[in-house]
Amino acid sequence: MTQLVLSGVASVGISGPEHRGLAGLEQVRVGSVELIPVAAPTHPLAKSVSNSPGAARDHIQLLLADRSTLTEGKDFGVVGVRSWRLADLGAKHALLVAGIGWGGMPEPMVRADLESGRLKHLELPEWSCAFYAMQAIYRTEAPPGPAAAWLIERFAKQSDATW
């Protein structure tokens, strides 16, 4: 999304923290979401009562790929030495439910799966509580108009009310 905003293809976007501090880009905090490590209950990491440090490295970690050239060669939240990179969060979710690998997911997206037993929250010593911050972004030289400014403000207020 950041690349689309910087190139002028999009005037406003919602992005994560990966591009914090880029020249020519303004950012307004509009929320965050907790990322938690999960796997299907049949996965070895889910079956273990207590995973030892480093246990997750031995299993395929499903990661969301960032196709932007701005983050080329950078990894975020990678624990495993064996990973599959996916372009879509929905595909990652489907593979996790199917028992293929483990990975960090937005807690609201997997809440029903955790409650129903389709996924299990993993206890991993190397995983620290992760909140993924989200910002509305726009080019410094092209501030949002009234409608986009209202939308950004609305996102920010909604986030303050729910977090």
Name the predicted role of every residue range.
Residues M1, A91, P143-P144:
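Short phosphate-engaging motifs
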Residues M1-L22:
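Central regulatory/effector-binding core of bacterial HTH transcription factors
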Residues V38-P44, A133-P144:
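A bilobed periplasmic-binding-protein/Venus flytrap-type ligand-binding module shared by bacterial periplasmic
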Residues R20, G24-I100, M105-A130, A149, ...:
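C-terminal regulatory
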Residues V5-L6, A87, P144:
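Generic signature of intrinsically disordered, low-complexity, basic-rich segments
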Residues V9-S11, R67, E126, E141-P146:
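Short, charged low-complexity intrinsically disordered segments located at boundaries
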